[in-house]
C-alpha cells in the first residue's frame, strides 16, 4: 500500500494528447476542434514526389484471422494486376504477439511500408509524428474526402493525418439462444436483472458448467467501464488529457459489479476457464462451440467469427443482442477499429497511398475486402462493398446497434499494451486476483490505478 500511496502522491503524469472529435462525451455534443485542426494541417503539408516509372516493391503488414488474410491477399493480387509495375509483399499473422513484433519494428525503423495499425499506436509509437507519414502529403493518390471529418480527426495526431480509419467498432453482446431456450429463456437479456436471472436459471436447469456469458480479463475491464459510464454518465477518462474521471470508490464499485457476475453464475470464473482453455480465445473454446457458454461481449466485427464457430446443434441460435442499459445513461464507446498507415521509411509513398486507396476506396478493392475488417468507414468503400453483397449481415447489424447506442469517448491510453496484454497486463492482474484470491474492489483498486499511472494516466 505504501508504494501505491507514494506513486499517487508524487507521480502526477500528464496524459497523451487525445482524439477530440471522435465521439461526443457521454450525452454531450461533438467537438469540432480536431476536425478544424485536421483541415489546418492539410493546408500546410508539402506533397510527396510522383509515381515511379521503374518497378516498385511495397511491403504491407496486418494481423487477423484466415478470412481477413485471404481478403487482403486477393485484393493485393487485384491491385498488382492493375498496376503491373508494383509488387506488394505481405507479412501477416494472428493477433497474439503482433504488437510486440510491430513495436520492435517501429523502434528499429524497419516496419513495412503500409501497416494495419491500432488507433492507440498513433500515440504509443508516433506521438510526435515520428513513425507514420502525414497522409495529407499523398492526397493526389489517396482520396481523404471519402471519410467524415470526425473519423479523420480521430487519426490526426501531432497535427498530422497519420492513418485513415478502416472501420469503426464497439462492443456488443452476442447470444446463443439455443442454450437460453434450454434454460427456459426466450428473450435476449436487456437488463442487469435479466443477466442475474439467467445465471440462476442456467445453473439450476442446465448445471454448474453452463453459463449465460463469458468475459475474459480485458472484456471484464471494458464491461466494467460500460457499467460505470451507464451509471454515472461520464467518460472513463478525459480523451484529451487521459485524466481519470472516476474516484477510487466508484472504480471499486465497478470491480465489485464484475464480482457479482461471477458470484451470480452469470460468467465463468477465470481459473475455471483457464483450466479448460488456457489463453485460447472464447470462440475456440469447447464451451462456446457446444453452447455451454451462451454469450459473449465482443467487438461488432467479430460477429461472424463467433457465429461460424458454433457447432451444428447451436448455429441457428446465434443472435446479435442489444446493448444493456445498466443505468440512466448510454454507456460504452466506439473507436477506430484499425487504420492503414504509411511509415516514414517507405521509399515509394505515392504508390503506397495508391494501394490504400485501392483497398479502401476503389470499387474493385473495397468489394474484395468487404467487411473483413469491419463495416467500411470510407463512404465509397462502403457503397462498393454493399453493391457487391460483401458486407456481412451479422457484422452490419451488430455495428449498427453499437453506433446507435454508445455515447462515450475512448482515451488513447485505455488500450496500452501494459494494461491490456493477455497474461501480463494490469487488467489481467486485477481480474485474476478477483477470482483466484477472492479479493474485492476495495482490495484491487490501487493495483488498477498504479497500472494506469504507469502508462501515463493522471489519477487524482
Which role does the model predict for each range below?
Residues 240, 396-457:
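C-terminal capping/gating helix-and-loop segments adjacent to ligand/active sites or protein-protein/ligand interfaces
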Residues 131-132, 137, 302-304, 338-418, ...:
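Mature extracytoplasmic/periplasmic domains
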Amino acid at each position: 500500500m505504501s508504494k501505491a500511496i507514494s506513486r499517487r502522491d508524487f507521480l502526477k503524469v500528464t496524459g497523451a494528447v487525445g482524439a477530440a472529435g471522435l465521439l461526443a462525451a457521454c450525452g454531450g455534443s461533438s467537438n469540432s476542434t480536431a476536425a478544424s485542426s485536421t483541415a489546418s494541417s492539410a493546408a500546410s503539408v508539402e506533397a510527396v514526389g510522383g509515381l515511379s516509372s521503374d518497378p516498385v516493391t511495397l511491403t504491407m503488414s496486418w494481423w487477423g484471422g484466415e478470412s481477413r488474410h485471404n481478403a487482403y491477399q486477393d485484393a493485393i493480387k487485384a491491385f498488382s494486376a492493375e498496376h503491373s509495375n508494383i509488387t506488394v509483399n505481405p507479412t501477416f499473422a494472428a493477433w497474439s504477439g503482433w504488437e510486440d513484433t510491430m513495436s520492435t519494428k517501429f523502434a528499429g525503423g524497419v516496419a513495412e511500408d503500409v501497416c494495419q495499425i491500432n488507433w492507440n499506436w498513433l500515440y504509443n509509437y508516433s506521438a510526435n509524428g515520428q513513425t507514420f507519414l502525414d497522409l495529407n502529403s499523398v492526397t493526389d493518390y489517396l482520396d481523404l474526402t471519402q471519410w467524415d471529418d470526425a473519423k479523420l480527426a480521430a487519426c490526426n495526431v501531432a497535427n498530422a493525418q497519420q492513418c485513415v480509419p478502416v472501420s469503426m467498432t464497439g462492443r456488443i453482446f452476442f447470444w446463443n439462444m439455443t442454450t437460453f431456450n434450454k434454460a427456459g429463456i426466450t428473450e435476449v437479456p436487456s437488463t442487469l436483472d435479466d443477466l442475474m436471472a439467467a445465471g440462476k436459471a442456467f445453473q439450476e436447469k442446465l448445471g454448474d458448467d453452463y453459463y449465460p456469458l463469458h468475459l475474459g480479463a480485458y472484456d471484464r475491464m471494458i464491461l466494467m467501464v460500460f457499467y460505470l459510464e451507464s451509471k454515472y454518465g461520464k467518460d472513463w477518462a478525459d480523451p484529451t488529457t487521459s485524466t481519470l474521471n472516476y474516484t477510487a470508490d466508484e472504480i471499486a464499485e465497478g470491480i465489485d459489479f464484475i464480482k457479482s457476475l461471477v458470484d451470480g453464475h452469470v460468467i465463468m470464473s477465470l481459473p475455471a476457464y483457464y483450466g479448460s482453455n488456457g489463453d485460447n480465445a472464447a470462440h475456440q473454446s469447447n464451451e462456446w462451440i457446444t453452447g455451454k457458454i451462451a454469450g459473449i461481449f465482443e467487438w461488432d466485427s467479430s460477429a461472424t467469427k463467433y457465429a461460424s464457430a458454433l457447432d451444428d446443434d447451436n448455429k441457428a441460435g446465434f443472435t446479435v443482442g442489444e446493448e444493456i442499459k445498466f443505468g440512466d445513461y448510454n454507456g460504452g464507446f466506439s473507436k477506430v477499429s484499425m487504420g492503414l498507415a504509411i511509415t516514414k521509411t517507405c521509399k515509394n509513398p505515392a504508390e503506397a497511398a495508391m494501394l490504400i486507396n485501392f483497398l479502401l476506396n476503389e470499387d474493385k478493392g473495397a468489394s474484395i475486402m468487404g467487411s473483413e475488417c469491419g463495416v467500411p468507414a470510407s463512404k465509397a468503400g462502403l457503397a462498393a462493398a454493399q453493391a457487391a453483397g460483401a458486407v456481412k449481415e451479422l457484422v452490419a447489424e451488430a455495428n449498427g446497434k453499437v453506433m446507435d447506442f454508445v455515447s462515450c469517448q475512448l482515451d488513447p491510453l485505455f488500450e496500452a499494451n501494459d494494461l491490456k496484454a493477455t497474461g501480463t497486463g494490469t487488467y489481467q492482474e486485477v481480474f485474476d486476483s478477483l477470482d483466484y484470491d477472492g479479493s474485492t474492489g476495495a482490495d484491487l483498486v490501487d493495483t488498477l490505478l498504479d497500472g494506469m499511472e504507469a502508462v501515463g494516466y493522471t489519477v487524482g
